[in-house]
Amino acid sequence: MRVVFMGTPEFAVAVLRQIVEAGWDVAAAYTQPDKPKNRGMKLVPTPVKEYALTQNIPVYQPQSCRDEAVLEELRALEPDVIVVAAYGKLLPQALLDIPKVAIINVHSSILPQYRGAAPINWAILNGEKETGVTIKIGRASCRERV
């Protein structure tokens, strides 16, 4: 199974690590561009970039996934599956149509509750006693409370 992974924060690293440990062929990791941080405004790589490089996975950091050149680059990777976990931006339909088999979205809440950004933070701020993860494959969803 040829996979392209898309994610940015530590939550996404946990998902990517499971894919790597399962022995899937990870063709590339897409993540947000490095951002300047701290007083020196030094560019800091995303957690996904740092992990992917330790696994010799090619890393792509496009400004936008709506750019036709980025979509062509992704098509050239010929993914069977694209796995998305906390990528950080909405993905265009043209990208969702690229994988041969499916696009899999891993979201850190039980959808539809806390859809969008920072679902774990919102669950904590709202004092939730339990939360969970939703794994969406194409149009189907699997939810598990934790």
Model regions: which residues?
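One-carbon transfer enzymes
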Residues: 1-145
